[in-house]
Each structure stands twice: as C-alpha cells, then as structure tokens.
Amino acid sequence: MKNKKALFIPLFIIILFIAFFNKIINFIINIKWFKEVNYLAVYFTKMRAIIILMIPIFIIFFISIWMYYKSLIINKNKSVVDIGLNKNNYGKKLFFIFNFIVSIFLAYIFSSSYWYRILQFNNSVDFNVKDPIFFKDVSFYIFKLPLFESLYKVIISLLLFLVITTFIAYFILEAKYKIQSKKDINLKNINHGIKSFAGKQLAIVSGLIILFISFGHLIKIWNLVYSSNGVSFGASYTDVHATLLFYKIIVVITLISSIVTLLSIVKGKFKPVSICIGITIFLIVSQNIASFLVQNFIVKSNEKTLEQPYIKNNIDLTRKAFALDDIEIRDFDIKNDLQKQDITDNKASIDNIRINSFKPTLEFYNQVQIIRYYYTFNDIDIDRYNINGKYNQVFLAAREIDTDALNPNTWQNRHLIYTHGFGAVMNKVNSVTSEGQPDFVIKDIPPYNKTNIKLANPRIYFGEKTNDYVIVNTKINEFDYPKEDSNKTNKYNGHAGIKMSFINRLLFAINKKDINFLLSKDIKKDSKIIINRNIVERAKKIAPFLTYDSDPYMVIYNGKIYWIIDAYTTTNRYPYSEPYDSINYIRNSAKVVIDSVDGDINFYITDKKDPIVNNYAKIFKGLFKEEKDAPKEIREHFRYPKDLFSIQSKVLGKYHVKDPGVFYNGEDLWEVSKDQKHVEGETNTNDAPYIIMKLPDQNKEEMVLLNYFNVMKKDNMIALFGARMDGEQYGKKILYKLPSDKTVYSPYLFKQKINQDTNISKELSLWNREGSKVQYGDTIILPIKNSLLYIEPLYLRASGKNSIPEMKRVILSYNDKLVLSSSIQEGIKEIFNSKDNKINDKNEKDSTKTIDDSKLKKAQEYYNKAIEAQKNGDWTKYGENINELGNILNSIK
C-alpha cells in the first residue's frame, strides 16, 4: 500500500509532463523564432508578466483554499468531519496536492487571461478627453475599467464556487457518515448540520458576495456610458435621472449589508441579514420600475427636448472616436463651366483616369502572366509611382507559388524545392492594348521592365499565399523560375530561418508531426527552416493585439518586393460612441513593413496622438519604431487604408449631422452610393476608388481615396468624401457637400442615364447578344474645379470557361453630354470640342441612322470566329477577329 502511494506522485508528474509536452515544444520553438526575428523581448514581455502575476495569485489561492479547508476540519463537533477529513494524514497530503494543482491552474488561467489588462492598467495613457457624465478621462474606460470588471467576475465566480463546493462536500460527507454508521438520512437536520459544518465560513463568504455585489453596481454606474436604452448610444435622460440614482443607493445599502451580514451570522442573528437582503432585492426591482416609469411617463412625451444634451454627447464622442471631428467641410457648387484651358491644367488628373478595373485585370493576370500552373496572383494592388519622370497610378501584383497546386505534391517539392514565388506584374491604370487588355510595364519571368523601377531580387519567400514552412540551403537546389525547357535554380542568400541542428530537427519533427525532418538526407547542418511566412500571420504572431487590414499591398523598393500592412488600434470601450462592426473607436496607428526575401518586419507608428498605440509602446518596449525611421521611398507608398475609410464612411452617413434636433428627427441620413456591375445586374455598394486628382484650390495632383454619398434610400448624390495620402497631406480628410436642390448623378443614376441613352443602349444590345456579355468597369466620378466628370469603362466578355473580359469602350459624361468613345482622350475631345451644350452632333445623327444588315452579319461572323479561336486557345486569331469586330462596330457608330 505504501509503495503504491509512493508511486503516485512520480506518476502524476510524468502524466503532467506528457500532457504539457506539446506546449513545451511550442514554447522552445517560439523562443527560437522570436529570437530570429529580433522580437524576443516582446515575447518575454508576455511570459514575464504571466509568471510575475502567477506567483502572488498562486500564493493567495493556495493559502485561502488551505485555510478554508483547515477551518472546516477544526469543527470537531460534527462526526462527519472527523471521519471524512481528519481521520489520517493521507487525506491531508492528498488535499495538499489537490490544492497545489488547483491553485497553480487557477493562477495560470487568471494570469494568462488578464496579464494584458493589468499591463494596460499600469501603463495607462490619457486621452485628454473626459466623459460628460462622470468627468473621467476616456483612458479610465479603456485601460482601467476592463480590469475592474474582470476582477469582479473572477472573485464573484470563486466565491460562488466556494459556496457550492462547501454544500457538495457537506452532502457527500454526510451521506458517507450515514452509510458507515448505518443511520437514516434526515433532511430536517440539514440546516443545523451545515451550520455546524461551515457556518462561519459561509457567513464570511456570503458577506464577501454581498460586498462584491456593491462593487458590481459601482461598475454598472460607470457602464451607463455604454447604455443603449435611449434614442442614441450612451447614458440617456432616464439613465442619468433614475437608473444612476438607484445604483448609487444600491451601492451604499449593499456595502452596509455586507458588514451587517458578517456581524449578524457570526452572532447567530439572521433577522438583520434577511432585512438587508430584502432591501437590496427591493431596490433592484424598484430601479427597473422607476426607470420604466420615467421613460414612459416623463421622457416619451418630451423626448426630443429632454434627450438633446445626451444626443449631443453621442454625436461629439462618436465623431471623435472615429476620427471624423477633423474633417474639412466645403460646399461644392457644381457649375459645369469647364473650358479647354481647365482640361489642360488638369491633364495629369485626366491622364491618370483609371479605365482598367480590378476584377478583369486580376483575371487577365492569372490567365496570361502566371507562366506556370503553380504560380498565382492573389490580388491586385493599386499604388502610385514616378515612372520615367511621370506621376502614374498603377496596378501591380506579386507572382506567388501556390504549393497546393504542385503536382506531384511531395514533401520535397512542397518544402525544399518550390520555396518561393518570383517577380511582379505592373500596368498603368490609364491604358490598355489594342485588344482591350492591361498594357504591362513590368511582366514575364525573368522580369521584362519598361520602367525605371529596379527589381533586381524579385523572389518572394514571404507573401499572402506562403502558408507553409520551407527549408533552404539544402543539398537540393531550389526551383527559381522556368526557362524554356529547363528550370533555373537558386540558393537562398537571405538571413531568415532557424538553423537545422539535430536538436532543432527533432523539435520540428515533433512540432510538425513529420518524421521527414529526421529522415531527410538533403537537410544539412547549415540548412534553415523558415516558418510563419504568411505576412499577416507573421505580424499577428508578434503583435496579436493589433487589428490588421484585409488588403496588404506590395511595394517595389531597393530592388526587392516589400509588403505593407495597415495595423489598427480598436476598442469597443469608448464612452458614448456608437458601435459599428463591434468597435466604437479606431485608428490606423501603425504600418507594418515586411521584406519578401529576408522576412524582416518593422512596426512604424503613424499616429503618435493615439493613446492606445502609445500604451502598447510602453508595454512592449522595442516593438515600435517612429515613422521617420522608415525609408523615405517606403513612406511615399503609404496609402490611406480602405477598411478604415469604409468604416468611417458608414459612420459619417449618420454622424455628419451635428445638430441634436436634426439628428433626432433622422431627416438628413446619408448612405454610400450604390453601383451596378452588369447591364441588367443587381446593385451593390460602390467600392471607393483611389483616384489621382487635383483637389479644388490645390495646384498639384495627388492620390485620394474617394467615396460618393446619396441621401438615404434615394439615388441623388449629396456629397463627396475624400482622404488624402501624399506627403504631408497624409490622413487629412475632406467632405464636399453638393447642392441638395439639384439632381447630381450618383454612380447608379449614371448607369441609368447610360441605359436610357438611345445610341449607347443600341450598341450595348448589339454586344450583349447571345454568346457575349457586357460588363461595367469601375465607375469614376472625377471632380475638376467646380465640375464633375463621369467615367465608365465597358468590358466585353465572350462565352466560355476561360474567356477574358476586354475593355472595349469608355463612356464619359459631363453636364448633359454623354459620349461613347474608344479612349479617354477621344472622349474628352468629343465632349469639349462640341459647340452645343447637349449630346454632340455625331450622336444626334446616329440616332436617326439605320444599321446596314450586311455589317451586322459580318459582325456576327467575326464574333463567331473569335469564340471558336478562344475555345481552341488560339489567342492571336482571337485578337484579330475581335479587332475586326471592333472596326465594324465603329463603322456602325
């Protein structure tokens, strides 16, 4: 028997080791990886905080539970206690082990769950904004109140756990005693039995529970700034004048009740306790009744007047939380009085009008430029570059390896040979080839480059599709890129990776559950494993507390490809701010820059005024760098992020209104304009475009992210909202309010105008015959001085699985003029060379012209030939026939 007991502890330790074996391996690998990326201090910040917290928490839990246990076995008046708990030392040893395990487990759970909130509490940074009810700085609600709430929940849960386990222990031991003594169980003596067993202990615990109910209502008071009971988010009239008063009374009464409970139960007097509990319950019920009465009999009939100051609080703090309080607002009086000189003065804006659209361009990239089946383009990025001395907006994408497409998909192919993507593709957004496809300035493998942008090392070891580990510098050469009938190979010369010593091979074999790490003869001592190669996951691994943009974008700099990810600080704890998408505060506080070859990752603070990112910087020393430390050539490519802009646009639709009375009436609500992608398709929310333009009153073109607003449930455009991003203008926002007494075409209304035009709709119908389909591109509405120029690219897609949309025409509209042209330049000439103020003469003549049947037959013939060539994969013939079709359509026009 003694031998069995002696074996228990070692056996238990072995079981624990096996249970936590994988965590130990992960911990060792994490240390190696964080050391490799030079963020080991960041990793140890968390580990150190957890360990430092665990020690005192473990001591508190262990001593509290042990003392509670000791206090129970001291009661010798109850025989069940002697039999069940105090018979021999073995029970004490067993409880000691149990207490140790439970205490260390609870300490770990608490520390690993709340270390972050404790560090935020200790490193709080003021917002210098006070809430209008309790006049506390916003930092209290974001950095301190969450910790109070967590402590409250944990302590209340533990106290209730003690009460429940005490009752369970009593009933188990009582049953054991009755069975051993062969006595009947008498439920009438339960009250006396529990008092004898744990009366004082339960008295103390009950008093503490009531004390923390008081603390809980104090937390409820502070949480009134998040109330959703009124007409706007935040504390309402009823919350302030009824709910708050009752909460304060409950706090005081429960505080007194906790003291009375402790004193009364110890003395055996239960009447005062019953009175205190009854009063507390009465007040809680009364609070709900009082709030209901105030809301329905005082506020409801005078809501607009009584709620105005609270609505104003909501407006002011929501605008501040979503960074809408610094928008420059201007009236945009549409005159449409452009002269030819104005066109000349805005030539750079017009030359950069985007006629290529995202989706068709990505399809074309993946049809024409993947080179081999295992390459892929994940998405299209838009940016601006100085190309051969000119400021150009471009589309570009990285050519990555899709390891899931490898055939055969062997371990060597996946992890040792096909280790990286290769190269990038770039085209200007403002031009297409004669076939209506993107006109490449960088393409092919090895890169064919018509620009001054150097791309000496185009390899992509880190990207959006690099989701698996690779091992480099092995005995097998890495595949670099295909070259005619052979393959070009490469040896990795970057500094990323963990050396594959025997110990590390063993660690990764266990971690990845793959014996190949040990069996492979291709792995050498100086081979390196590169893990966490997905750029977003790499950033999350280092800084999981940041929120990352859904669209990382690539930049070509210093002969290599770099990735930029926008990182946000968010919270749902900003007082009085209306939540959108589960958050009520957001800042684009950091840019993450990642080297696609070496994997170097840097976090640059781009919003020094954000208290949350400054709080993180105080906690994680060495994580963030200043924006000025980023290379100038990288900073020039920082974009205003579309995810942030989209959220701000949603909020602005309601919170452009500053007057509480107008806000209450809901009479001036906006929504982001709708758009239509197909001639007979459904509408969807317009995707805000990045546009190169010269803002009114500015003398230089810049890239602007622009959104169009309609009046809610109407199609008339009411405003233009733009975010600037070039140089010192980065982050500045501007709102142009359009005349409300005029019909201003939104993207959707513009599409309706196109569909209603006799001449254009006739041509669309001709193209949209069976076997082909007309698609709209991305609608652009370009402000030029006090005028609006509308642009709509038209794509023609042939039937067939692998058909590629071709940009065939551009529709331009200005004032009352609407033209269908082969290019932007031709359309501009057609509009501004016209003498009248309506549809140009050419279109008017066309409206009465009959179409030659022979030309229609010829058009059908060339179209059929093009479709046949496409099915056969003969793209040369396809292009020739489509060109002939275009010539016929032009002659009909």
UniProtKB/Swiss-Prot annotation:
PANTHER family: UPF0182 PROTEIN SLL1060 (PTHR39344:SF1)
One GO cellular component term: extracellular region
Coiled coil spans: none
InterPro entries named in the record: UPF0182
Spans traversing the lipid bilayer: 9-29, 49-69, 94-114, 154-174, 202-222, 246-266, 273-293
Keywords: Cell membrane, Membrane, Transmembrane, Transmembrane helix
Family per similarity comment: Belongs to the UPF0182 family.
Annotated Pfam families: UPF0182
Cellular localization per UniProt: Cell membrane
Annotated organism of origin: Clostridium botulinum (strain ATCC 19397 / Type A)
Membrane protein topology class: Multi-pass membrane protein
HAMAP family recorded: UPF0182
Protein's UniProt name: UPF0182 protein CLB_0018
